[in-house]
Amino acid sequence: MKMKYGLYCMGSLVNTYDDAIEAHNDAVYAQEESGVPHEVREIQ
């Protein structure tokens, strides 16, 4: 089963990804730009 990953900001799903590395890179970029913590979680 292929995993999906969600990018979350303040508990809200912002975007979904098929690739964990891409999701992580976007989370780092979004956090640097906004100053607000973002996180990546697996979606089941």
From Swiss-Prot:
Recorded name of the encoding gene: yosI
Tell me which species this is from.
Bacillus subtilis (strain 168)
Q: What is this protein called?
A: SPbeta prophage-derived uncharacterized protein YosI
Phylogenetic placement of the source organism:
Bacteria, Bacillati, Bacillota, Bacilli, Bacillales
